[in-house]
Amino acid sequence: MSVTNSNRKRSLSEVSEGSDPEAPAKTRNSYTTDEIVMVEEVDSEIPVNISSYGDAETYLKWQNTIAKVVKSVVSIHFSQVAPFDSDNAVVSQATGFVVDASLGIILTNRHVVGPGPFVGYAVFDNHEECDVTPIYRDPVHDFGFLKFDPTKIKYMNIQALELKPSLAKVGSEIRVVGNDAGEKLSILSGFISRLDRNAPDYGELTYNDFNTEYIQAAAAASGGSSGSPVVNSDGYAVALQAGGSTEASTDFFLPLDRILRALKCLQSNKPITRGTIQLQWLLKPFDECRRLGLTADRESQARAQFPDKIGLLVAETILREGPSDIKIKEGDTLISINGELISSFIQVDDILDESIGKEIEIIIQRGGIEHTVKCEVGDLHSITPDRYVEVCGATFHELSYQMARFYGMPVRGVFISSASGSFNIDANERVGWIVDSIDNKETPNLDTFIEVMKTIPDRQRVTLRYHHLTDQHTIHVTSIYIDRHWCSEFRLYKRNDVTGIWDYENVAEPIKAEELKPHAAKFIDIPIDIPEIATLSHSLCMVSTVSAIPLDSLPVENVKTSGLVIDAEQGYIIVSRRAVPHDCLDVFVTFADSVMIPASIVFLHPTKNYAIIKYDINLVNANIITPKLSNTPMKRGDRTRFIGFTHNNRLVTSETSVTDISSISIPSNIIPRYRATNLEAISIDCNVSTKCNSGILTDNDGTIRALWLSFLGERQDNKDKIYLMSLDITDCKEVIELLKEGKKPKVSIIDAGFGAISILTARIRGVPEEWIKKMELQSENRLQFISVSRVSFTEEPVKLQTGDVILAVNDKLVTEMSQLDGVVSTADDEESQTLRFKVVREGKIIDLNIKTIYVKETSQIAVFSGSILQPPHHAVWQSMMNIPSGVYCTFRGESSPALQFGISATNFITHVNETETPDLDTFLKVIKQIPDNTYCKMRLMTFDNVPFAISLKTNYHYFPTTELKKNIESGKWIENELNKTEEKKIIKSD
């Protein structure tokens, strides 16, 4: 099971020939759901300023035309389900229009239909809705066709727009009728200014049209108008809206010539043939053609033959190993094909599309010399991917002609369209990678790649060789971890142009992980003259984790940090909870940069930001040493030695001193997730420590005094903020001792937030002078009181209130935060503890009996319609005054029905089809009764307790309902795909 996240909206620079190189950025005009602030439904009868039409007759003509056209225009709400080729997985809106009412054919853009899986529906002018499925997307040009069932539209007569490409003329007044900027209907006016511009270039690693003229006009269309008809005053479609400038009112329309041919093929049930010689032409003006070697005779002939043309086609990019490779060179001017003089892209397309498998004769001029070459025309569809593979959480397909053309490379290779999961090779670049080999086996094509992946066992580490399209000179080599348990699917998807669905087959079941063998490792002492310090390298290791599921709203990432061995005989290691936030992940320990072995999670502290893991001591043969742990808390002014790991995993050391020990409050994230609370952090005067994300503080005799840990904080500017602080080892000692005794520890806590306040503040709040004197007499480190900063919502209400000043617990004066850590016990202890609190509230001393609670880690999640649902985790209880439901959304996929229909992270689902869903089990029972591709009503509650309702359409083919549940006794996670089979699969064992 894997989850992807992506975003489609982009602004790109145009650099195509014939335009100003400093031209403003361009964008395609599809509209992303996340960018909709408010959608207003605009009535077809739009008030119009008559003066803008020149006269009343023109106004009435346009008014009548628009009234007819809007009956053909539809708003398309769609999801491109999987990352494919140049397109991310995305939910968006666009426009289309009916071109055949009887067959139910809608014309829109290719970048709307997309090259990969598509799910969508169309909304007609009268707000009737029907599903649409792709029946054709052009391999190169920016158009595609969707099909709908005309019988589903009951309350209006469907009208088709007639395509008239010949009516597009310079100076013609036009209207763009569509879903502009997410509006239900917008009508934009303009005039055609050019018919012969080259296709706009939207930049690299994205879809670009080429080998066609584009029409230019000024209509100021924006996001959502993609696929809109460009109509004249007679109501004919003369072009198709495709893109435009983000900084000017310039729009780009696709001519309808090749679209009309494709439509006729569909109407007559004939294949839409598309030929290619794998060459990109650009239209260049005659003066530039002359500079490239066009002779005067040929120029005169062309000007006479095509008096309305301003230039000829010139070879721009010739793909290596293609039919025209070597025969045609960049800068060659095209004269004729098969004896026909050529002046436009339309002529070239017409010849190539009818000549697949045949040889054509091409005359070009190069440096004033005429050359005749012969090329065999290939099938453009054959070099356009129509299948992809999902394995190890990533997606792969053959390199497309679209991508190969942009970079001038052969159309071959395995393209990673989503570098995630095991193939998360660069967190900043998810697309554009080519797999050269894996497990030391070359992968020249997708079939070979599939066969190689079949042979690799689960949990194996293999070598990956790869490069990026933007830098073909640099070959990267790395080792990757094959995950076939969390990301268990190995599926081959293939496009079905009859149904519009991408059918899939399961390629292979995971091969069981190989049995691990023990290895020896040699430690290098720390280069220091103090033997007790030098050998501490034998007690340190690197801990790395691999996560695949955004449990508890925590990031899906691979984290590496250092750990400290606390018991070498039993294999216990203490590590930051930043690396081990939950147990729905894989943990590995590396000793001496030599031996890596798996580890299991045995303890997660609910508030102190540390975890304890365990490794098999029989798998590593090395001199691992259990260090001495201090029993004395650190104090301000203590001298100590910092030992830490830099970002490149190098050990560094420095003498330092403790500058402060104070209570720290880590800011909460806007989406609640685990953070350390009620901390007293140790600050040190050491520049080296700021360069290390993990380490220890030690005495000169090697006694461990504190852990240097990384703490996950809030998310800002799309980045997680990480705090670096020291945690006194005595705060962990009680738990460590229980583990050494062979007992399983657990911690019950006072579920409230605390912070330090000064004596002055305490006096103002009403703390009596006698208690202030007690504090002054007994406090050794800092004169402070502890106050309640917040109280969590719990099943049994906490009697503390925000603002309470804590005087004593169990009759002992509270001077430090550590006195409120809660109670450490063993797993055998069923009952939580009750503590006697004495507090000052509103100037009065009161006594309270406060019951501690055990924090439950998440042990069940469900994936429904692309959303991750689970019981509210502890951070949610900490952040809210009440919990509306036990079904909490912690994440939603960027191409999912959850996003499309309005489920957001931090929403609670309270009802499904008016059935209350108080917990996840009830929710799953209700969902199992809902058929595929049907709407269900959901009532939800926002994080701020605002109720709302949505209707959501299920899609179990691409978004099945899956449950992951942990057996608390065995520690095994079980995956169950509810919509497909009742077969249960164990995917991880602790």
From Swiss-Prot:
Residue ranges for the region (Serine protease) are: 73-263
Q: Which UniProt keywords apply?
A: Apoptosis, Hydrolase, Nucleus, Protease, Repeat, Serine protease
One GO cellular component term of this record is: nucleus
Give any Pfam family that matches.
PDZ_1
Which subcellular locations apply to this protein? Nucleus
Q: Which residues form the active site?
A: H111 (charge relay system), D142 (charge relay system), S225 (charge relay system)
* Transcription regulation found in the keyword field: no
GO MF annotation list: serine-type endopeptidase activity
UniProt-annotated stretches for the region Disordered: 1-32
Tell me which domain of life the UniProt entry assigns to the organism this sequence originates from: Eukaryota
Example GO biological process: cellular response to heat
Q: Specify the PDZ domain's residue ranges.
A: 290-368, 758-843
Q: What is its EC number?
A: 3.4.21.-
Record's SMART domains? PDZ (SM00228)
Q: Which InterPro entries match?
A: PDZ, PDZ-like_dom, PDZ_sf, Peptidase_S1_PA, Peptidase_S1_PA_chymotrypsin, Peptidase_S1C
Q: List the disulfide bonds.
A: none
Family membership:
Belongs to the peptidase S1C family.
Q: What does this protein do?
A: Nuclear serine protease which mediates apoptosis.
Q: How is this protein named in the record?
A: Pro-apoptotic serine protease NMA111
Q: Which gene encodes it?
A: NMA111
